[in-house]
């Protein structure tokens, strides 16, 4: 089972979805002003109420260090962040 990381105190950063493949259960996003790929896992999306993401979609991420590099520990809708 995929664990949901603790993101308390982790900065929220604006990002854009690079690609997401629902059938594979993962994808990548880029944080604004950075070319580093941020891993997006389907279980994290589901935990935060998403069922899918589209390429180019604006989101807000809380990025943590995952087993293979930077990953989204939390995904928030751009529209719900004030």
What are these regions (language model features)?
Residues 14, 60-62:
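Beta-strand secondary-structure signal
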Residues 1-13:
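Short boundary/loop segments of OB/S1/cold-shock single-stranded nucleic-acid-binding domains
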Residues 11-43, 72-74:
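S1/OB-fold single-stranded RNA-binding interface
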Residues 65-82:
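OB-fold/S1-family single-stranded nucleic acid-binding modules
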Residues 33-35, 57, 64, 77:
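Ubiquitous "structural anchor" signal
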Residues 34-40, 48-51, 65-67:
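Histidine- and aromatic-rich ligand-binding microenvironments
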Residues 47-60:
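Short nucleic-acid-contacting surface segments enriched for D/E, G, S/T with interspersed K/R
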Residues 20, 62-66:
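Short beta-strand micro-motifs enriched in acidic
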């Amino acid at each position: 089972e995929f664990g949901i990381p603790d993101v308390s105190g982790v900065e929220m950063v604006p990002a854009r979805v690079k690609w997401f493949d629902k059938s594979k259960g993962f994808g990548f996003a880029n944080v604004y002003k950075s070319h580093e790929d941020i891993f997006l896992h389907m279980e994290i999306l589901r935990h935060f109420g998403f069922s899918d993401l589209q390429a180019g979609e604006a989101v807000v991420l809380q990025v943590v260090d995952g087993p293979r590099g930077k990953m989204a520990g939390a995904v928030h809708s751009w529209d719900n962040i004030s």
